[in-house]
Amino acid sequence: PIEPNDYVLNFQQTEHAAWLCMIGNLKKWKEGTLKREMTVKGQPITLTATRGECHGTSHWVDFRWDNPEITFADILEVFGELPIPPYLNRDTQESDKETYQTVYSKIKGSVAAPTAGLHFTPRILDTLKEKGIDLEELTLHVGAGTFKPVKSEEIEGHEMHTEYISVSRGTIEKLIAHDGKAIAVGTTSVRTLESLYHIGVTLLKNPDATEEELHVRQWQPYETAEEAANITSVKALQAILDYLNHHKMETLHTSTQIIIAPGYDYKIVCAMVTNFHQPQSTLLLLVSAFVKGNWRKIYDFALGHDFRFLSYGDSSLLIP
């Protein structure tokens, strides 16, 4: 989202919203404004889309419609289509709205489901609670760049996408109470939790940092590794809690471009539940960094025992 850049506010917009969009068959959209008449919530509207400047592989697109009672979320419900993985080789079905979604999802904004969470049913969640296992929820709006393969020979040549995260005060407090450690469900949770540590490091250096300054840059963890060497996860998390207290905030909202690759030193995640990922993906780099040199052994075992890969595939619990 660009105008406004908050997901919730953008979905609530009436008459106008702007996004950075990946556009298929771009050559067919020479110039000018596209127009479509449609019916939303029983009311006829005219929707226009104007293509703006290019930002890498995306374009600024300005959406406008002529009914102030219709929100952008209403338009997406009618005009949009659930983006299921392309390797399924089929069109989206109505049932996907339920099956390609976690049972605990609440906030709209991701372009893909956090598929490690698909394995968790209400019964499993209840069983975990009965065993005294604390469950906390956080938000990372998965960006389209998560599907972008690593094509460069060197990891330095790959540019990570920016994703927006939200973490509540209660979750920060729970993490501190558990010595700054957690089991992450899915790589989305991993990226969010590890980003928290580096946000805390930023706040320890600059307690008055703005929301923009809290953004975790792609190579930030590696650039600050030496100065952050003696900062524990609890200390970093406490800095975030102090920041929330000072600004009388209940939720931390910021963004991350973190890339987790071999050589990364995990700070908060002590175990992770994750599916099996495809070659040339940043997700496989993340797993490799976590299990060190054992990722080939793990994946050879999965292949040798006919495990299913990717979104609707089997899962694993990784403990380094």
Question: What is each PLM-predicted segment?
Answer:
Residues 1-320:
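Surface-exposed, charge/polar-rich loops and edge strands
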